[in-house]
């Protein structure tokens, strides 16, 4: 998804959004220094830009996920009874997703996870089976509160129903973009003190999605501070450190300036943070 990041940088520059440009530059500076930072952390700025340019498509955090989508064969869970497409199944899924979209219904999310796992067990085509396994993993994550329950996860849940409708009519094509979005949320899940649910664990393992630290795509992580103030703060800290070292070495002439320098550092932190 490198082209998405380039697009973000160009849009920010064209629209003359200083905070956005600062965020992109700060992110790129960290990458060049070898810091482990996800481009998804630029999502708040990216979303603002997309809103300003009047994009017809909703901004999605997975737009910035640096993954090129490829289908992997994710086997169905062992011991899960196969479930066939049927009007009664669609009615069950409609009700469950509606409750999920209303928020806070972990039982309905788990029901969707179970039904999706059953659909996966009934598929003979690898992509269809993998899709339903990813859907099962996605709903397991919602059921256990392993990633945010927000407008993006709710939209994804409703899109699963549209994909079901298409596949139940005999259309074997599966949306790459929907699978990518669902897998993105699966990548956010961290087990904490408990064990990862089965479908989610399998999807994370096969796609290599497990992470060591959480990712907050709604929280601004870059461009929060004025670069000029940050530079001034660094200079003041360096000057205060030099004075302190001199005092420790017995240079009492620095006593007159040490209080002023530390006060300046304190002021910098007040305005910067």
Protein language model annotation of sequence segments:
Residues 1-11, 15, 19, 107-144, ...:
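Extended, amphipathic alpha-helices with heptad-repeat/coiled-coil or helix-bundle character
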Residues 5, 31, 96-104, 123, ...:
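Secondary-structure edge/capping motif, primarily at the C-terminal ends of alpha-helices
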Residues 60-110, 213-257:
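Long, amphipathic alpha-helical coiled-coil segments characteristic
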Residues 3-83, 145-226:
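Structural secondary-structure packing elements that flank or coincide with functional cores
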């Amino acid at each position: 998804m490198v082209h998405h990041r380039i697009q973000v940088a160009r849009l920010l520059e064209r629209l003359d959004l200083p905070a956005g440009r600062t965020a992109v530059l700060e992110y790129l500076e960290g990458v060049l220094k070898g810091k482990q930072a996800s481009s998804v952390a630029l999502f708040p700025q990216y979303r603002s830009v997309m809103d300003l340019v009047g994009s017809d498509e909703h901004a999605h955090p997975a737009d910035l996920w640096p993954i090129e989508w490829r289908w992997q064969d994710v086997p169905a869970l062992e011991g899960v009874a196969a479930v066939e497409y049927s009007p009664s199944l669609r009615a069950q899924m409609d009700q469950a997703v509606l409750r999920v979209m209303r928020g806070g219904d972990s039982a309905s999310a788990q029901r969707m996870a179970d039904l999706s796992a059953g659909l996966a067990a009934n598929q003979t085509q690898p992509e269809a089976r993998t899709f339903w396994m990813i859907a099962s993993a996605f709903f397991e994550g919602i059921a256990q509160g392993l990633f945010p329950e927000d407008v993006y996860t709710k939209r994804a849940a409703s899109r699963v129903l549209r994909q079901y409708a298409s596949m139940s009519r005999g259309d074997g094509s599966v949306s790459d973009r929907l699978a990518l979005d669902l897998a993105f949320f699966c990548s956010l899940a961290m087990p904490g003190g408990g064990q990862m649910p089965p479908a989610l664990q399998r999807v994370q393992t096969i796609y290599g999605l497990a992470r060591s630290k959480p990712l907050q795509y709604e929280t601004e992580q870059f461009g929060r501070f004025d670069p000029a103030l940050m530079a001034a703060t660094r200079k003041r800290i360096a000057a205060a450190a030099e004075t302190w070292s001199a005092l420790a070495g017995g240079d009492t002439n620095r006593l007159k300036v040490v209080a002023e320098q530390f006060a300046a550092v304190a002021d910098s932190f007040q305005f910067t943070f």
